[in-house]
Amino acid sequence: MSTNAIAKRYAKALVQIGAEEGNVDKFSGELSQFTGVLAGSTSLTAVFSNPAYGIEAKKEILKEIMTKLGLSNNVANFLQLLLDRNRLPFLPQIVESFNSFADDLSGVIRPTLTSGLPLEQSQIDEIKNSLTKATGKKVVLKVEVDPSLIGGVVTKIGDKVFDGSIKTQLAKIQDILQKG
């Protein structure tokens, strides 16, 4: 089974449990806390990925981390399950899938807006409002600046790309001129 399929299966199960209890946001925060601890410590990552450490030692370390973070029983049990089934190395992908499912559940999209020049807040708000009206969902916009675009904006929503950059327009003109 592919890593992506594994991640989606575990993430979907945790989102369903969170949705039943109204704790999806809480679970998301707790998963982020835990992954932050792992990402901040190469030695912890090494321990959990090294088969030389026994499962009991890993369980004790995991239990200690979960206690210090004050994780809910559901998230703690979920992490314990991942450890038992040797799925902890997939945690970053699981968290990414979890957040995606949670966004779908709550009607949130997270597009990326890339512009050639820094945009004013009023322009960002106008684009955000347009996206909200077009999609009917809450928009959490990530804004980036890429000077290579020269001007205009590129908006990415999931797999869809809306490219209104001058760079792309110039490339199209160049292509037309070359073809004659």
Swiss-Prot record:
Q: Name one Pfam family in it.
A: OSCP
**HAMAP family recorded for this chain?**
ATP_synth_delta_bact
UniProtKB keywords: ATP synthesis, Cell inner membrane, Cell membrane, CF(1), Hydrogen ion transport, Ion transport, Membrane, Transport
**Which protein are we looking at?**
ATP synthase subunit delta
As for subcellular location, the record says: Cell inner membrane
Quaternary organization: F-type ATPases have 2 components, F(1) - the catalytic core - and F(0) - the membrane proton channel. F(1) has five subunits: alpha(3), beta(3), gamma(1), delta(1), epsilon(1). F(0) has three main subunits: a(1), b(2) and c(10-14). The alpha and beta chains form an alternating ring which encloses part of the gamma chain. F(1) is attached to F(0) by a central stalk formed by the gamma and epsilon chains, while a peripheral stalk is formed by the delta and b chains.
Asked if the record carries the keyword Heme, the reply is no
Query: What broad class describes the main subcellular location of this protein?
Result: membrane
Q: Which GO terms describe its molecular function?
A: proton-transporting ATP synthase activity, rotational mechanism
